[in-house]
Amino acid sequence: MKSYAIIQTGSKQYQVSEGDIIDVELLDGVSEGQEIVFDQVLFTFDGSKVSLGTPTVKNAVVKGELLSRVRGEKVIAYKYKRRKNYHRKIGHRQNYLRVKISNLVM
């Protein structure tokens, strides 16, 4: 089986393997092409051995490369009050970082 890890970043958890491309919440102080290290590894599987962290796995890191900054799909919030001619339409697009996972160190 293929090795994978579960990491936590931006209050979300992602299951990643080498070569995966994921969109994560914005991180401070990173630029395109720069290496990103995710040190909050909650779970690892290397094909035969399972490591479960309490809360994180010791000495396990996931390294990735920042590919680009992307924006998510537009979310529309619409509210109105009937018979009062009141309505508001608000749109929001979340900013993300697109990261390619390059290495799992277990």
Swiss-Prot record:
InterPro entries: bL21-like, bL21-like_sf, Ribosomal_bL21, Ribosomal_bL21_CS. SUPFAM superfamilies: L21p-like. One of its GO terms (cellular component) is ribosome. One of its GO terms (biological process) is translation. It comes from the Bacteria. One of its GO terms (molecular function) is rRNA binding. Pfam families: Ribosomal_L21p (PF00829). This protein binds to 23S rRNA in the presence of protein L20. PANTHER family: 50S RIBOSOMAL PROTEIN L21 (PTHR21349), LARGE RIBOSOMAL SUBUNIT PROTEIN BL21M (PTHR21349:SF0). Belongs to the bacterial ribosomal protein bL21 family. This is Large ribosomal subunit protein bL21. The gene is rplU.
